[in-house]
Amino acid sequence: MKTNFLAFGMSTLVAKNIGSITQVIGPVLDVAFSPGKMPNIYNSLIVKDQNSAGEEINVTCEVQQLLGNNKVRAVAMSATDGMMRGMKVIDTGAPLTVPVGEATLGRIFNVLGEPVDNLGPVEVTTTFPIHRAAPAFTQLDTKLSIFETGIKVVDLLAPYRRGGKIGLFGGAGVGKTVLIMELINNILKAHGGVSVFGGVGERTREGNDLYMEMKESKVINEQNISESKVALVYGQMNEPPGARMRVGLTALTMAEYFRDVNKQDVLLFIDNIFRFVQAGSEVSALLGRMPSAVGYQPTLSTEMGTLQERITSTKEGSITSIQAVYVPADDLTDPAPATTFAHLDATTVLSRGLAAKGIYPAVDPLDSTSTMLQPWIVGEEHYETAQGVKQTLQRYKELQDIIAILGLDELSEEDRLTVARARKIERFLSQPFFVAEVFTGSPGKYVSLRETIKGFQMILSGELDSLPEQAFYLVGNIDEATAKAATLQVES
């Protein structure tokens, strides 16, 4: 069977370097090339042929190993069903390249940068290779600055670093998706930035739900797709490990364009960073490497470092990354989450208990941490206020058992005051979101860091002890709380 490679849009020059499959083991294949025509590591190979049923096969692979005897071992980015020994393979002579730029906003891509949302081809003029060097030391922005999100609980108690990495911990149904969408919305309004969402090895249903919710909350504008604020890249659970291992790099490459060329602040979401490690582990075993601790790949730290080092601030722009972290069997010492923690600047922990109370965002104020919460970075005023809030909430937590058994009346006057203030703080940490307006009917609020600090200082100082705690629930700044208290008084 003679294959016309020119019909596939390949130049005569590239079409000359053609190999053939010698072995297929699941998603891994060995390809033989002519002597002196060996492709480089990370080169993209394309299997273009027909299977025994006469159906076209078009599978992109990535070279991982040079085996000797003019053979290479490559990992397929899609299913290898129907592949046979002897099939022709084209060496493209370059790594995987993906489309970048404004045209990617509002669209969904797979690992190869192909649109999968049935909205037609993407009109792009620029493509970037997914394997790129991290910014050089001289390009890095070493200034520590806070990345204001407009979300009170985050900005006050676990502030994000501009160009930092944040771990997002939370089970199902505690508001992870809504928090992600609010951050996408706020970065556009406050920083004029864009977002890239990388769905790595998660459920297809969740990816679809996220897309539908983004359309509903206007993060993706269906009428005018170019006004959308986010590009989506999906490599879901059903994809081969090669795709799940590389989809994070595809999303990161799209984000790098906005940082380096457009000089914007970019939010990069990776959901879930554990699946990136898991896919690498599967590929490593298939490539015949000796596993290390708990069966993970021996190159775990290197793979994680290669991805994470590219996520940083430069003097031109920044990529701030929020990574959902799945902790297998809740074991924080497992090599996958343990390696991830080494790279994180802050953790945002979502609590099911707070979600059950109806306090959204359900960010746990005591479990969430940030390396930025230091007096010489955020300033004395911010630091003292945050510590005061945490101490009050911690004391309330300690007193809860006593309250449950004996009731509030058995507490000392001082403790009763602490409980009253803690309950106000807990409610004031809630906030109406812009992306939830559709469901709640109350308009979203962006609260600046200065207003957030002022509000919590007033609660801690006792200025607002006379106000009812309902006045602090789901409001923006402290002025809204006092206005709501006045309204409640009139109504009663």
UniProtKB/Swiss-Prot annotation:
Record SMART domains: AAA
An example Gene Ontology CC term for this record: proton-transporting ATP synthase complex
Entry keyword set: ATP synthesis, ATP-binding, CF(1), Chloroplast, Hydrogen ion transport, Ion transport, Membrane, Nucleotide-binding, Plastid, Thylakoid, Translocase, Transport
EC identifiers of the protein: 7.1.2.2
Catalysed reactions, semicolon-separated: ATP + H2O + 4 H(+)(in) = ADP + phosphate + 5 H(+)(out)
Broad EC category: translocase
PANTHER family: ATP SYNTHASE (PTHR15184), ATP SYNTHASE SUBUNIT BETA, MITOCHONDRIAL (PTHR15184:SF71)
Protein's name in the database: ATP synthase subunit beta, chloroplastic
Organism of provenance: Marchantia polymorpha
Gene that this sequence comes from: atpB
